[in-house]
């Protein structure tokens, strides 16, 4: 063989897109003939798709790059598989050739002999190929169904030229003789004519003998050159051996040849069928003519290619689509986000620039899923646009992504030892010849990694940032996904699409579609509760669905587990830390929602330590309304940077007042768990305690709203219970101030708890004689008195008074305060003489020490007047209460709680003297102001309501009294935790 694979000129490998002709053979004999026709033999492909099972021979004929494949076995199915795989791997193929051997069907019009050539050509009956085993049996006959496509116009016009060539047969013979000129190539040359026997219909060869009297006598040809016939070729999976069937095909279908592969190709592979005749489609089968028949068919194909100008095969640019995940068939919602992304990404948006868009949002919110869906939609809408995906999780994955781009485009030089792959990829994509492309940079969170210059190992010691390798082309677009809003603005300017948690309806749909048993136990109310608990976060919902599927439970069952776990941080963390499989995430990713933010925590700790410190504190206080002043002081610039970092990761949200923040509930839980696993939670909770204690004020009438705003954070941080030694002073101060808040707002039971805790800690740390300890003893005794535990109050107050005398002296304001409080206890127990004596003594000492208009002095005046009233000395009581009220209005203001107490007490004196109209007016004023200042459910407000109702009854206004008492009872029911001191005893009139 003179022009075989062994002797043809060899060339290096070419890229798959450089091949324009596909050549398919059915058997090795046909492959040998095809290879003999190659002008040049090419090297094999550098790589081949894993789903392509073909084995290719590559070369060129007449300037065309040709790819040849041989089927593993006969049949239309194998031909179809081979053709599909070939077209996927070699995307620039313009047409194909099915070249090999077949069975000829001679007729009166077509004197077909062995060694002749049959070429598929459309006719009135068909497009050049029919499928003889595709049809229906009708009325004892057979009706073919279906229609196969014909050859492409380019080949038909070339065939027309060949048919006009008078010397075609001679040229074919010369090519065969030249290709198989070696001495051992005899079987490839023209066989003996006596082996060409055609039997009459119905008298085919039976066994190994021939029936000579039934042989068709044909005129001997003068030349051995093959003759070419054109018409329909019949193809199917069944072998034709019947003369009757052969005659039917010739007469009814115009068939000139039968074979077993072409029907599998015609409807999707633009090809022409060329067959060398090796038998007559009857029982007379032997292999003597197969080599020659294969050779002449291959020679015809070569001549055909040589008359088609290579320039007519204009190559089209190959389009690549390389993403790590399949399309999500259950993609839900996010249409507005996708619209924004797709609108901004198309080059038509601004043709003079490379479009850049960033998708940003909290980890687990679905950014990668949106980018993936965008990739598939762009492929569908713009099939000429290549799509590439790069994971920016680390430098290695970034480099691997650029290497894959180079491999896909067969960029020269990538296999060199010191190849700068990223520069090669950038240079290639930045050229207009690269065509349209979309580059997706996923997880572009680390600004340092992307924008900080690092020394490259390219031999020249240069330093470049990874971002400098991003290509620029007016035909290109880059889509980033990032958890970091700052990174998003770095990468895409104002073209940022912010993704938040799903709307509830989409969350419910995601939950339901993620379940295996979708209808089982799907109670919508429970489902709504669950997605709200999970903050409508897609990753958390997928995790919950995976747990439900794995354990074959219902949503209601999972909800019970979640809500019971929510009573304990650790139990909830364990539930939300259970791993699950997610085909739409990287294998290296942490799938559980509790783990997904760990990389972000580390990034923040590295890039902005102050932001990390803010996060630690926010993780230890209440989730909502975190005041800016709670955060450790820093310069304005540093504070803005730190807050900006946390908002950039969507961990916190700045509220409209710009002075407070909310932290995402699950992020807060994850941050606490992260601190715990690192052994830092104990110290960080102490830091948070210090900050809360620093800002939580000692209660005053003026700062009531501040205390209300800060109380949830104080309560939350105290749930940690154990704190470092350096936080103990802050703990004592905070307990004291919370107790004071509760006391001043009438929540005496709560006040007792916090006063008692503060007292116990102060005893341990400071000792019983320390002023702070004594102060806490006094506070606790006062609370006992307020909710009627007079014996305990008297005992503790006596201890307090003795200690104060020892430590401060008898004239000290704190000692006088204790004397006042003990007098109140005497009064409440009906010991008016002792109360009056002690209160008079206190009042005189306060006047001397503090002055007549000091609030403490006024308090003693009020208390003494009350004792007079309790003993029926109304004139003295009224005079002293009037004096007290006027001084309080001047010094404290008309709406101060102490002023309101004096108003109430003066009205009580009026009532006891029978001056009901004056009492009613003053009670009404007091009640109105107490509602405004203290709130409707404060014990003092309820006391005013009770007093006014009594005055109504005393005046016969029973309807007004009944209505007011119902209001009082409803307010008391709403706040059962409060226990006010009993209403003052009312002295009966004599």
From Swiss-Prot:
<feature type="region of interest" description="Disordered">
    <location>
        <begin position="965"/>
        <end position="990"/>
    </location>
</feature>
<dbReference type="InterPro" id="IPR035994">
    <property type="entry name" value="Nucleoside_phosphorylase_sf"/>
</dbReference>
<keyword id="KW-0378">Hydrolase</keyword>
<dbReference type="GO" id="GO:0016787">
    <property type="term" value="F:hydrolase activity"/>
</dbReference>
<keyword id="KW-0677">Repeat</keyword>
<dbReference type="InterPro" id="IPR027417">
    <property type="entry name" value="P-loop_NTPase"/>
</dbReference>
<comment type="function">
    <text>The N-terminal purine nucleoside phosphorylase (PNP) domain cleaves the N-glycosidic bond of ATP, and to a lesser extent dATP; has very weak activity on adenosine and deoxyadenosine and no activity on (d)ADP or (d)AMP.</text>
</comment>
<feature type="domain" description="NB-ARC">
    <location>
        <begin position="334"/>
        <end position="563"/>
    </location>
</feature>
<feature type="compositionally biased region" description="Basic residues">
    <location>
        <begin position="981"/>
        <end position="990"/>
    </location>
</feature>
<dbReference type="InterPro" id="IPR019734">
    <property type="entry name" value="TPR_rpt"/>
</dbReference>
<feature type="repeat" description="TPR 2">
    <location>
        <begin position="774"/>
        <end position="807"/>
    </location>
</feature>
<dbReference type="Pfam" id="PF00931">
    <property type="entry name" value="NB-ARC"/>
</dbReference>
<dbReference type="InterPro" id="IPR002182">
    <property type="entry name" value="NB-ARC"/>
</dbReference>
<dbReference type="GO" id="GO:0009116">
    <property type="term" value="P:nucleoside metabolic process"/>
</dbReference>
<dbReference type="InterPro" id="IPR053137">
    <property type="entry name" value="NLR-like"/>
</dbReference>
<dbReference type="GO" id="GO:0043531">
    <property type="term" value="F:ADP binding"/>
</dbReference>
<feature type="repeat" description="TPR 5">
    <location>
        <begin position="900"/>
        <end position="933"/>
    </location>
</feature>
<feature type="repeat" description="TPR 6">
    <location>
        <begin position="942"/>
        <end position="975"/>
    </location>
</feature>
<keyword id="KW-0802">TPR repeat</keyword>
<feature type="repeat" description="TPR 3">
    <location>
        <begin position="816"/>
        <end position="849"/>
    </location>
</feature>
<feature type="region of interest" description="Purine nucleoside phosphorylase domain">
    <location>
        <begin position="22"/>
        <end position="304"/>
    </location>
</feature>
<feature type="repeat" description="TPR 1">
    <location>
        <begin position="732"/>
        <end position="765"/>
    </location>
</feature>
<protein>
    <recommendedName>
        <fullName>Nucleotide-binding leucine-rich repeat (NLR)-like protein</fullName>
        <ecNumber>3.5.99.-</ecNumber>
    </recommendedName>
</protein>
<feature type="repeat" description="TPR 4">
    <location>
        <begin position="858"/>
        <end position="891"/>
    </location>
</feature>
<dbReference type="InterPro" id="IPR011990">
    <property type="entry name" value="TPR-like_helical_dom_sf"/>
</dbReference>
<dbReference type="Pfam" id="PF13424">
    <property type="entry name" value="TPR_12"/>
</dbReference>
């Amino acid at each position: 063989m003179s022009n075989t694979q062994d002797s043809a000129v060899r060339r290096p490998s070419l890229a798959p897109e450089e091949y324009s002709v596909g050549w398919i053979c059915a058997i090795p004999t046909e492959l040998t003939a095809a290879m003999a026709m190659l002008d040049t033999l090419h090297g094999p492909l550098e790589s081949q798709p894993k789903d392509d099972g073909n084995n290719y021979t590559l070369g060129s004929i007449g300037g065309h790059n040709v790819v040849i494949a041989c089927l593993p076995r006969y049949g239309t199915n194998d031909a179809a598989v081979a053709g599909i795989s070939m077209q996927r791997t070699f995307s620039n193929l313009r047409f194909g050739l099915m070249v090999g051997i077949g069975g000829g069907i001679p007729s009166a019009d077509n004197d077909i002999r062995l060694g002749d050539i049959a070429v598929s050509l459309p006719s009135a009956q068909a497009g050049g190929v029919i499928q003889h085993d595709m049809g229906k049996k009708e009325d004892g006959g057979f009706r073919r169904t279906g229609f196969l496509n014909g050859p492409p116009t380019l080949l038909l016009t070339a065939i027309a030229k060949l048919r006009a060539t008078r010397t075609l047969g001679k040229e074919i013979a010369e090519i065969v003789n030249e290709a198989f000129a070696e001495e051992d190539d005899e079987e490839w040359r023209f066989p003996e004519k006596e082996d060409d026997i055609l039997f009459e219909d119905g008298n085919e060869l039976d066994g190994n003998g021939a029936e000579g009297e039934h042989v068709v006598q044909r005129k001997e040809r003068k030349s051995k050159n093959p003759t070419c016939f054109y018409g329909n070729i019949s193809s199917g999976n069944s072998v034709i051996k019947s003369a009757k069937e052969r005659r039917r095909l010739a007469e009814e279908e115009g068939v000139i040849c039968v074979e077993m592969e072409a029907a599998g190709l015609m409807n999707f592979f633009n090809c022409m069928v060329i067959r060398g005749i090796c038998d007559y489609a009857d029982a007379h089968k032997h292999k003597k003519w197969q080599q020659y028949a294969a050779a002449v068919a291959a020679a015809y194909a070569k001549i055909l290619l040589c008359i088609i100008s290579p320039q007519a095969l204009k190559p089209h640019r190959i389009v690549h689509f390389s993403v790590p995940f399949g399309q999500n068939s259950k993609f839900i919602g996010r249409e507005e986000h996708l619209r924004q992304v797709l609108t901004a990404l198309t080059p038509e948006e601004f043709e003079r620039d490379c479009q850049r868009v960033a998708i940003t949002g909290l980890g687990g919110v679905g950014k990668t899923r949106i980018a993936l869906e965008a990739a598939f939609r762009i492929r569908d809408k713009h099939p000429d646009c290549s799509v590439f995906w790069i994971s920016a999780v680390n430098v290695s994955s970034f480099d691997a992504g650029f290497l894959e781009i180079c491999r896909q485009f067969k960029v020269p030089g990538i296999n060199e030892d010191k190849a700068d792959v990223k520069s090669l990829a950038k240079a290639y994509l930045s050229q207009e010849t690269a065509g349209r492309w979309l580059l997706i940079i996923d997880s572009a969170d680390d600004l340092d990694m992307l924008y900080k210059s690092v020394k490259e190992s390219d031999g020249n010691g240069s330093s470049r940032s990874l971002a400098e390798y991003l290509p620029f082309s007016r035909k290109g677009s880059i889509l980033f996904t990032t958890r970091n809003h700052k990174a998003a603005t770095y990468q895409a300017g104002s073209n940022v699409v912010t993704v938040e948690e799903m709307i509830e309806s989409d969350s419910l749909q995601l939950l339901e579609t993620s379940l295996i048993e979708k209808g089982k136990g799907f109670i919508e109310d429970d489902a709504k509760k669950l997605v709200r608990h999970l903050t409508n976060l897609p990753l958390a919902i997928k995790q919950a669905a995976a747990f439900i599927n794995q354990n074959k439970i219902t949503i209601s069952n999972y909800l019970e587990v979640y809500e019971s776990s929510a009573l304990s941080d650790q139990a909830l963390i364990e539930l939300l830390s259970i791993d699950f499989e997610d085909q739409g995430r990287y294998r290296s990713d942490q799938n559980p929602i509790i783990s997904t933010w760990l990389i972000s925590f580390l990034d923040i700790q590295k890039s902005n330590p102050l932001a990390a410190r803010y996060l630690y504190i926010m993780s230890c206080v209440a989730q909502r309304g975190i005041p800016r002043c709670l955060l450790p002081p820093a310069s304005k610039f540093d504070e803005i940077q730190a807050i900006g970092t946390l908002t950039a990761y969507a961990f916190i949200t700045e509220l409209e007042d710009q002075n407070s923040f909310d932290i995402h509930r699950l992020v807060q839980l994850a941050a606490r768990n992260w601190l715990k696993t690192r052994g830092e939670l104990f110290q960080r909770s102490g830091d948070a305690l210090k900050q809360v204690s620093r800002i939580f004020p000692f209660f005053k009438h003026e700062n009531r709203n501040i205390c209300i705003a800060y109380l949830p954070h104080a309560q939350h941080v105290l749930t940690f219970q154990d704190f470092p030694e350096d936080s103990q002073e802050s703990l004592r101060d905070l307990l004291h101030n919370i107790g004071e808040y509760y006391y001043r707002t009438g929540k005496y039971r709560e006040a007792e708890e916090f006063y008692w805790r503060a007292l116990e800690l102060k005893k341990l740390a400071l000792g019983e004689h320390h002023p702070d300890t004594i102060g806490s003893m006094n506070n606790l005794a006062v609370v006992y008195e307020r909710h009627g535990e007079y014996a305990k109050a008297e005992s503790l107050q006596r201890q307090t008074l003795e200690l104060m005398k020892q430590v401060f002296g008898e004239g000290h304001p704190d000692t006088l305060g204790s004397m006042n409080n003990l007098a109140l206890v005497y009064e409440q127990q009906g010991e008016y003489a002792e109360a009056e004596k002690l209160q008079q003594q206190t009042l005189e000492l306060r006047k001397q020490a503090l002055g007549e208009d000091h609030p403490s002095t006024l308090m003693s005046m009020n208390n003494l007047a009350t004792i007079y009233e309790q003993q029926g000395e109304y004139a003295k009581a009224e005079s002293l209460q009037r004096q007290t009220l006027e001084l309080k209005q001047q010094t404290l203001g008309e709406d101060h709680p102490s002023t309101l107490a004096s108003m109430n007490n003066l009205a009580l004196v009026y009532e006891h003297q029978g001056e009901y109209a004056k009492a009613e007016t003053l009670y009404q004023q007091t009640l109105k102001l107490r509602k405004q200042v203290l709130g409707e459910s404060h014990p003092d407000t309820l006391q005013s309501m009770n007093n006014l109702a009594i005055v109504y009854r005393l005046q016969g206004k029973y309807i007004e009294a009944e209505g007011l008492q119902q209001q009082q009872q409803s307010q008391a029911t709403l706040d059962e935790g409060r226990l006010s001191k009993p209403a003052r005893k009312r002295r009966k009139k004599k």
